[in-house]
């Protein structure tokens, strides 16, 4: 796929897209071999623009953790249908108020997805994880191009958190009480550190043309 944009004072303004190109015309059909391969990974990430919604049940039924980027599409019917198959829902929601975003998070959790990452542009990000709501202010820089900032936050947060989560444990009762001894406490620290890292990584993306340095001027 491709998407032409204008860059106005560092902010990307979409002019259109080719609507997913070949992926939309010929969507992926996952085989048993594909599922077996994907089971090697901690997380499977996809999006509303990948056109594999009918395949999500296959992934969740195989016990795979799936994160899904809804972009800025707030379709209650789609949320209700897909959320039961997701481990984490990701959304871009800078146009909504804080209260509206809280309601959106509650709705997604109610529909069966336990975790939510919600990016809000210059208002930062909200993460609902392990039954708790966290917030992170943005790391503000002189932006060259904001294309991909939200995607960068999502990627950096999820990879960082899952990497640290594997080490979060409840310690057995023993002499002394120094450090983090409870799994829940360690996970809370992991969430906050991961959000901090994600904000910094997203800021670095804003200083690259075309998100990762390969933007092309059209015309």
Residue ranges and their predicted role:
Residues 1-42:
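Conserved N-terminal subdomain of the carbohydrate kinase-like
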């Amino acid at each position: 796929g491709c998407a032409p944009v204008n860059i106005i004072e560092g902010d990307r303004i979409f002019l259109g897209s080719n609507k997913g190109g070949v992926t939309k015309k010929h969507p992926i059909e996952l085989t048993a071999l594909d599922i077996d391969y994907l089971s090697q990974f901690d997380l499977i990430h996809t999006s509303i623009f990948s056109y594999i919604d009918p395949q999500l049940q296959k992934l969740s039924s195989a016990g795979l953790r799936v994160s899904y980027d809804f972009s800025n599409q707030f379709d209650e019917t789609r949320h209700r249908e897909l959320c039961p198959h997701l481990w984490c829902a990701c959304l871009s929601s800078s146009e909504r108020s804080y209260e509206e975003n809280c309601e959106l998070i509650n709705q997604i959790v109610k529909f069966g997805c336990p975790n939510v990452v919600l990016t809000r542009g210059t208002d930062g990000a909200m993460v609902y994880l392990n039954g708790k709501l966290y917030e992170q202010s943005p790391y503000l820089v002189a932006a060259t191009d904001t294309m991909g900032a939200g995607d960068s936050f999502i990627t950096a947060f999820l990879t960082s958190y899952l990497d640290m989560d594997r080490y979060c444990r409840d310690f057995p009762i023993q002499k002394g009480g120094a450090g983090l001894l409870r799994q829940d406490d360690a996970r809370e620290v992991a969430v906050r550190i991961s959000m901090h890292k994600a904000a910094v990584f997203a800021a670095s993306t804003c200083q690259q043309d075309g998100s990762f340095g390969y933007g092309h001027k059209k015309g």
